[in-house]
Amino acid sequence: MATRIAMVAGEASGDLLASHLIRAIRQQVPEAEFYGIGGPKMQAEGFDALWPCERLAVHGYVDALKRYRELSGIRKALLRRVQADRPDAFIGVDAPDFNLWLEGRIRSSGIPAIHFVSPSIWAWRGGRIKGIARSVSHMLCLFPFEPALYEKAGIPVSYVGHPLADVFPLVPDRAAARELLSLPTDCRIVALLPGSRQSEVRSLAATYIETARLLAERHPDIGFVVPLATRETRALFEQALHAADADELPIRLLFGHAVEAMTAADVVLVASGTASLEAALLKRPMVISYRIGKWQYRLMKRMAYLPWVGLPNILCNDSVVPELLQDDATPQALADALDRWLNDADACAELALRFDALHRELRQDTAGRAAAAILPYLNRSPEWKPSRQSA
């Protein structure tokens, strides 16, 4: 009888991660069958998508509330299917708000439930890890400091590295990136990344444009590239340029190409998030800037216990790059922070060494290590019940 694995990936990044995992498991278990909720990359690996992962996509709290009944119905229908089919294992890929509820009920049915990509429990106070302990048979972590948190709570855990570290070259090619983007080789380039969400671009675009204006006044040879993920975010940034009367600034907007823009750049101004990790893997000096609603920020400050929001600082356990948040994210402060990188080659070289060490630590063949951690859970007998020892 073929090994059967149920999976849920809730967004495009999870679809990619899960597709690599399916391929890695199949290298060890060629007859394995996969089904559940997934996207086109998973389907290209032979995944049977009962629902497309796009059905799980929500945009903010209001959208989540509006679609609660629909999403709850999908989750309960999948739970019934899994409990009836009794696959060898269930793997939830990211999407913790959807998956942890599902995993808890699947695990209590005697089916191993593995969660791939630890929620950011390290960023928040409180007892969320207690709920995770009740839900999962095994946690797969992307960052090296995470396993200790789960081990302390008695949760079986494996460190598998970060998939971006496997993909990104250890030595990025700035010249090739500039050639690809038709950027000059004899000037300094600043990449401006105001975020992928419309709310982020609305919040940061005007500030980033004024920052660019200040830098252009100081450096006649400077240029700016702004990769934007969608037509909507591009339109918002264009509106901000028009409102700022900034037609004279050497700012070039790109559709996508965020990695290429950062590779081509001398320094990066980036909203906190995965893009800051990408900038670190590309060994680029950066300034992290973020602005959210005042009540959200107060809540975040009350709940958070880490002194940083940016992944480069969190992973290095040190303030290696500036973070300017909320009211501190003024054009003057951002321009001054970027200027310090532009004027200090030694500091940039030292930072590149820190980021190189981080890159090597995260480069672990994520899909292969994740598959190796999952394999012991496959082909369990029907009588198997989860326990600290067997998990």
From Swiss-Prot:
GO terms for molecular function: lipid-A-disaccharide synthase activity; phospholipid binding. Keywords: Glycosyltransferase, Lipid A biosynthesis, Lipid biosynthesis, Lipid metabolism, Transferase. Pathway: Bacterial outer membrane biogenesis; LPS lipid A biosynthesis. GO terms for biological process: lipid A biosynthetic process. It comes from the Bacteria. It catalyses: a lipid X + a UDP-2-N,3-O-bis[(3R)-3-hydroxyacyl]-alpha-D-glucosamine = a lipid A disaccharide + UDP + H(+). This is Lipid-A-disaccharide synthase. It comes from Aromatoleum aromaticum (strain DSM 19018 / LMG 30748 / EbN1). The lineage of its organism: Bacteria, Pseudomonadati, Pseudomonadota, Betaproteobacteria, Rhodocyclales.
